[in-house]
Amino acid sequence: MSGGGNLLTLERDHFKYLFLTSYFDLKDNEHVPSEPMAFIRNYLNCTFDLLDDAVLMNYFNYLQSMQLKHLVGSTSTNIFKFVKPQFRFVCDRTTVDILEFDTRMYIKPGTPVYATNLFTSNPRKMMAFLYAEFGKVFKNKIFVNINNYGCVLAGSAGFLFDDAYVDWNGVRMCAAPRLDNNMHPFRLYLLGEDMAKHFVDNNILPPHPSNAKTRKINNSMFMLKNFYKGLPLFKSKYTVVNSTKIVTRKPNDIFNEIDKELNGNCPFIKFIQRDYIFDAQFPPDLLDLLNEYMTKSSIMKIITKFVIEENPAMSGEMSREIILDRYSVDNYRKLYIKMEITNQFPVMYDHESSYIFVSKDFLQLKGTMNAFYAPKQRILSILAVNRLFGATETIDFHPNLLVYRQSSPPVRLTGDVYVVDKNEKVFLVKHVFSNTVPAYLLIRGDYESSSDLKSLRDLNPWVQNTLLKLLIPDSVQ
C-alpha cells in the first residue's frame, strides 16, 4: 500500500507478516497475502528510500511491545539502514568450552555481545573495513587476537563473524551444522560496550564491491537483515483430521494427555516444542499465523509406551499420527493428522531412539535419564539407548531396591552378564522388554553365567555413566 509521496506503507495488522518473513529464514513467501508483499519485499531488499519511515518506527515499536528478547532500543530509523547492534547478549559461559577452533575465538565470561544486522559470505574480505573501525575505538592494540573471522582485544572487546544465531549462554561441546542461510551466512557481532556505542553513534556501511554497478545496500559482498534470528521456517501441510487446544502451565496436564493417548490405540506421539516460544510475548494473531508454519530447528521427541511384561502385540492406528505441539509458553495443540509421506517435521539431529513415557507402573531414579524401578515386579533397569520422559516423581536409588534372590544351585544366566560387585553378588544382565526396548537389569543374588563374565568397561557410555551415578552418586555431577 502506498502513502503520501508514493512511499510504501504497511498496516499494523500486517506487521505479523513482516515479522514472519524477516525474523525467521523463510524461503517461500507464497502463502503471504499479496497486499503486504510490496512493502515486505522492499524491506528485505533494504530499498528504504521507497518505504515510509513512520512505518519502520511503528514496526520497531511493535517489536518492543511484544518484549522481543535481547532487543536493543532505538529512536531512529537508522537502526534499519546502517550497520547497527540490534540484539544484546552477555557471554556467560562459566565452564570450559570444548570448541571447534576454526571460526570461534576466546571471549571472557561477562562480555556483552551485540548481534548486528550485517551479514556476509566472506568475512575475510570485510576485515580491513572493520579493523579500521576498530582502530577508531581502540588505539592500543597490544593484546589483539586476529584471524579471518574477527579481531578480539584481551578477550572482551572487538568484533567477530559467526552464525546468524549463537547461544552465548550455552556450552558448545562439538561442531554443530551451520544452518543454510542463503548467500550470506555470517553475522557480524560486536564485543564490548565501546564497539557497540561506536556503531550506534555513527552511521556506517561497508564499502561496496569494486565491480558493483549500483550502490545497493544488499549486494554480492554483504547485506543487512534487520531483527533477524534466522531460524529456518517451513509451511506445515498436514492433513488435520481433528485438533484440540490445551492451555496450561502444568507439565502434569500434558503428561496426562500423553498417557491417555498411549493407553488408547496410539503406539507413539510426536511431542514438538517450538524453539522460539520464549523469545517474546507474541500477540494472538501472530501466534495463529506461526501455527501455520514450523521451524526445522524446533525440538521433537518421539514418545512411545513402555511395556514391562509380555502382552499381546498392540494394534495401533497406523493411518494417522498424533502431534502434541507446544506453540507458546502455555499453549499446546493436539493434532490428529493423516500419516502421509509428504509430512515434514523438525530435523532430529539427536540420533537417539525414541523416548519412553514414564507410566504409573514404574518410577524414574533420581539423577538419571534412563534408569527406573518397577515396584510390582521388583526390578531395576537401565535403558540401553532410550531416555525416559514424563516423570512426575522420582525416587533415590538404595541398595535395598536390589532384592537378593537365593538359589542353590545358582541360577545360570545366558547372554551378556556384567560383574558390578563380585563380593555383593551384583550383576548387570542384558535384557529386551516385550516391546523390543533394549535394556539391562541390575540384579543381586546367587547367579552364575553360562559364558565369561564381562567387565563394565565393555558397556556403552550411556549405560556406564548411569550405573556410576547410581552406585557412586558423588562421582558424576
Curated annotation (Swiss-Prot):
Q: Which UniProt keywords apply?
A: Host cytoplasm, Host nucleus, Virion
| Subcellular localization(s) per the UniProt record | Host cytoplasm; Host nucleus; Virion
Note the InterPro entries from the entry. Answer: Baculo_Y142
UniProt GO cellular component terms: host cell cytoplasm; host cell nucleus; viral nucleocapsid
Q: Superkingdom of the source?
A: Viruses
Protein name (Swiss-Prot/TrEMBL): Protein AC142
Organism for this UniProt entry: Autographa californica nuclear polyhedrosis virus
Pfam families associated with the record: Baculo_Y142
Q: What does this protein do?
A: Required for occlusion-derived virus (ODV) envelopment and subsequent embedding of virions into polyhedra.
